[in-house]
């Protein structure tokens, strides 16, 4: 994978998270379940061999690549709400990268959750509950919280709150990854075509 492919894959991870948050907040459900599984998988992969492994392979991140193309393209399919979520994820991730102590603690806490899943076979709900707690304790205090729009009936459910925070944490993970592989905000202005061309190429590979 070249640097642009890596950046687009990370952006696809962010886009998948934002899209999933919107869908869950509006409908109270997230289908297919593989989307959530891919994002949780990305959180628990701390020493991957390559960037695709973070998401369990290119096939799993394909919906995120498609979502990124919709958001970054010049067509009418852009969703302002998803864009706002993406901006919020980038903002919080930049704050996180400026606090290495919090970043290290985040890694330690996620390692604990990974151990719970592998050694004690915790159910998905328990894993989401743990990951949501990490988001609430370590990410939320970093700055202006990401305001989630949706159906109040769905948003007040504890299970959905845990799920949304887990999805946001996965989005933060992808946003950090994007910056670690050289992603810059100016790329959205000066390198948009390059990113979109790369995304289209990845779709044909995935």
Swiss-Prot record:
Gene Ontology, cellular component aspect: cytoplasm; plasma membrane
Translocase among keywords: no
Topological relation to the membrane, as annotated: Peripheral membrane protein
Origin: domain of life: Bacteria
Gene3D superfamilies from the UniProt entry: HflD-like
RNA-binding listed as a keyword: no
Xref: InterPro entries: HflD (IPR007451), HflD-like_sf (IPR035932)
Pfam families reported in the protein's UniProt record: DUF489
Keywords (A to Z) from UniProt: Cell inner membrane, Cell membrane, Cytoplasm, Membrane
Location relative to the cell: Cytoplasm; Cell inner membrane
Similarity-based family: Belongs to the HflD family.
Protein name: High frequency lysogenization protein HflD homolog
Organism field: Idiomarina loihiensis (strain ATCC BAA-735 / DSM 15497 / L2-TR)
